[in-house]
UniProtKB/Swiss-Prot annotation:
PANTHER family: NADPH OXIDOREDUCTASE A, NITRIC OXIDE SYNTHASE-RELATED. Binds 1 FAD per subunit. This is Sulfite reductase [NADPH] flavoprotein alpha-component. Its cofactor is FAD; FMN. It catalyses: hydrogen sulfide + 3 NADP(+) + 3 H2O = sulfite + 3 NADPH + 4 H(+). InterPro entries: CysJ (IPR010199), CysJ-like_FAD-binding (IPR003097), CysJ_Proteobact (IPR029758), FAD-bd_FR_type (IPR017927), Flavdoxin-like (IPR001094), Flavodoxin/NO_synth (IPR008254), Flavoprot_Pyr_Nucl_cyt_Rdtase (IPR001709), Flavoprotein-like_sf (IPR029039). It comes from Neisseria meningitidis serogroup B (strain ATCC BAA-335 / MC58).
Length: 604
């Protein structure tokens, strides 16, 4: 409602009679307080007496409201934030919720109560949609937040060194800028449901109590905010995956390649599952039976020993196969195991966090048992393990092209540790143990932060290395199916042209058909001097800048630890060199692209 509308809602009030004015002038503070309450109550019933309601006569107290923000790579943070917001609204609290990609960072200065749920990507970095706020809070123009109360829930994976680092960074910076915690930060691991539910329950109880103390009547928000969509995937989800059939498993790297990359095709017929280019497919898997046997043999545990898992009793061999994480080590496992395996060397490892992190990254769980033998019961061992979690793979097909199928591009994890061959959990399941027509449990994980432009006439630049090319196959398939006018440019890198050119014939056909307008390939090991995608970006600086001036959207997919950082540095060099901006101006330009959703990353 405009100011003009507010002024004309009711007829003007007549002036008070002189005798009333004289009487009021003699009231003390206590009498004024009583009279204001009496008048307000009467005003609430004024309309029934034919009197105008005093809608603007008294200043309204500030409503008790909470802002709930989420920053997510795959959607988990958003789902938790939405649940927290729903809980608060059910308690009668006014809630404003948003994903950080849709939130104006400068608005943070005006917030009074804030809940933030954030994941972490790469080497402890915030998700791409949180970068603008992260930079603001850590920059020279960071606002004072002394009027803000906040709580942070971090989502992460404790097998990585910088566990929940983005949540830790936001939590610390809020406090440094003067904000006060509503609750201590919670760092939730892959199996985050219990931690997230407890955090949501605690914050809802606390804020409900605070709202009751507040004189303003909470105004529940009953209409979902704009942009909030119902998941299109029907009843199949992470908790209830669809039992799909494997259609194809084809190795697409050459026999001589050091990489084993598979093109996987899965049948979704009958599932009513829908996905968009940029989405991921969640894959549930069983651990390798040989790995389960090796672990039980090392511990001296009878495979038939009954334990409780998944809410029911079952043999420990079955539990380890289907319910517990065996291929990703964690600091928590090593510390817990050290309490049973009394070795001075192991004690030294857990005493130094940097050494522990390096040990975890390079030593599988089974090889911890080999190196430091110990005797544990089945119950003692499983208490050290995390629940098994699905793996997410970027979808490499467009449903407009393949219908009820979904395609994946899977890099199979294979390595040796102290002479023993090891294989990744999900990638080994898909490549080695899942037979054609065999069943694999899947679900669609939306990724709204990695989407083609709504305007299909806009040009796109796709930058990826290795299996990071997967979503770009889906992008170009989609544009070809739509006969889109927008130009497509692929910048792709891998070690060798002859061994590692993923989907070579398809890219050639797309180019021939007019749907791949420009392409640059970086083969890092085909010459003495290594060439990477970032080198191609710098080499094509003028052309890339021209595409940006034409409104191009840039997409980056691949390794977060090295490749994504090097690509961003190269993009900044392009903006500085071809765009004639200084370093600060280039950073601001890249931030502008982020805010306009013209610079999107899917890194892991």
């Amino acid at each position: 409602m405009s100011e003009h509308d507010m002024q004309n809602t009711n007829p003007p009030l007549p002036p008070l009679p002189p005798e009333i004015t004289q009487l009021l002038s003699g009231l003390d503070a206590a009498q004024w307080a009583w009279l204001s309450g009496y008048a307000w109550a009467k005003a609430g019933n004024g309309a029934s007496a034919g009197l105008p309601a005093l809608q603007t006569a008294l200043p309204a107290a500030e409503p008790f409201s909470v802002t709930v923000l989420s920053a997510s790579q795959t959607g988990n943070a958003k789902s938790v934030a939405d649940k927290a917001a729903d809980s608060l609204e059910a308690a009668g609290i006014q809630v404003s919720r948003a994903e950080l990609k849709d939130y104006k960072a400068k608005n943070i200065a005006g917030e009074r109560r804030l809940l933030l749920v954030t994941s972490t990507q790469g080497e402890g970095e915030p998700p791409k949609e949180a970068v603008v706020l992260h930079k603001l809070l850590n920059g020279k123009k960071a606002p004072k937040l002394d009027k803000l109360q906040f709580a942070v829930l971090g989502l992460g994976d404790s097998s990585y060194p910088n566990f929940c680092q983005a949540g830790k960074d936001f939590d610390r910076r809020f406090e440094e800028l003067g904000a006060k915690r509503l609750l201590e930060r919670v760092d939730a691991d892959l199996d985050f449901t219990a931690s997230a539910n407890a955090w949501t329950d605690n914050i809802a109880a606390l804020l409900k109590e605070e709202a009751a103390k507040n004189r303003a009547t909470p105004a529940p928000q009953t209409t979902p905010p704009a942009g909030l969509q119902t998941a299109p995937d029907g009843r199949y989800c992470k908790a209830a995956p669809f039992p799909a059939a494997l259609l194809a498993n084809q190795k697409i790297t050459a026999r001589q390649s050091d990489k084993d990359v598979r093109h996987i095709e899965i049948d979704l017929s009958g599932s009513d599952l829908h996905y968009l280019p940029g989405d991921a497919l969640g894959v549930w898997f069983d651990n390798d039976p040989a790995l389960v046997r090796e672990i039980l043999d090392l511990l001296g545990i009878d495979p038939a020993t009954e334990i409780q898992a998944g809410g029911k009793m079952m043999p420990v061999a079955r539990a380890l196969s289907s319910h517990f994480e065996l291929t990703q080590n964690t600091p928590a496992f090593v510390k817990g195991y050290a309490a049973f395996a009394h070795y001075e060397e192991l004690d030294k490892i857990i005493a130094d966090n940097a050494v522990l992190q390096d040990f975890v990254q390079n030593t599988p769980i089974v090889d911890v048992l080999h190196r430091f033998p110990a005797s544990l019961t089945a119950e003692q061992f499983i208490r050290l393990l995390r629940p098994l979690a699905p793996r997410l793979y970027s979808i490499s097909s467009a449903q407009a092209e393949v219908g009820d199928e979904v395609h994946l591009t899977v890099g199979v994890v294979r390595f040796e540790h102290e002479g023993r061959a090891r294989t990744g959990g999900a990638s080994g399941f898909l490549a080695d143990r899942l037979e054609e027509d065999g069943t694999v449990r899947v679900f669609v994980e939306r990724n709204d932060g990695f989407r083609l432009p709504e305007d299909s006439r806009k040009p796109i630049v796709m930058i990826g290395s290795g299996t990071g090319v997967a979503p770009f196959r889906a992008f170009v398939q989609q544009r070809a199916a739509e006969n889109a006018e927008g130009k497509n440019w692929l910048i792709f890198g891998n070690p060798h042209f002859a061994r590692d050119f993923l989907y070579q014939t398809e890219w050639q056909q797309f180019a021939k058909d007019g749907f791949l307008h420009r392409y640059d390939f970086a083969w890092s090991r085909d010459q003495e001097e290594k060439i990477y995608v970032q080198d191609k970006i710098r080499e094509q600086a003028e052309g890339l800048w021209q595409w940006l001036q034409e409104g191009a959207h840039i997409y980056v997919c691949g390794d977060a630890a090295k490749m994504a950082k090097d690509v961003e540095a190269a993009l900044l060099d392009v903006i500085i060199g071809a765009g004639h901006l200084d370093e600060e101006g280039a950073e601001e330009y890249l931030d502008m692209l982020r805010e306009e959703k013209r610079y999107q990353r899917d890194v892991y």
